[in-house]
């Protein structure tokens, strides 16, 4: 319960407070994290945002900024691998009322690296999903995430993050990148695997 409350607080701060204009200014250099049209990409934090996370003394969330045109809604889905196929295990769907929308997605994780919560900030609202920690523990684990800008194609899922857990210390882990894991679940040999995707829906 403590982790769940902390995750909810962190998600609210990350998305409601930190989105701002999405323009980034760093020491000695000036860059922008504003994504291009119909693009989702890893966010770059301002110094103020980084200082806020340090003040909270929590693990830094994984952040993505996006810009999308012509979408009627979005769907965030959490999948768990079962018998070589991805099975839905949670998610959230919301409408989009703006023809040209910019926003930010924040993912938080537990001490063992597993998914703990997600927040979606766009316009004036923030939606959140929190997940209680799994009771089973893994001896080793690995995770991967989307590292480069990705073109948003309406009605096609975009894999943002993948997690792999092993129950035996001697087991080797092949940590596929999220896009490969989404398309090739039958190749995953880990004892446990989880995947998060986002899909922007076309109008009509």
PLM region spans:
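Bacterial N-terminal signal peptides that target proteins for export
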Residues: 1-10
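C-terminal motif of bacterial Sec signal peptides marking the signal peptidase cleavage site
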Residues: 17-21
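Mature, Sec-exported extracytoplasmic domains of Gram-positive
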Residues: 26-204
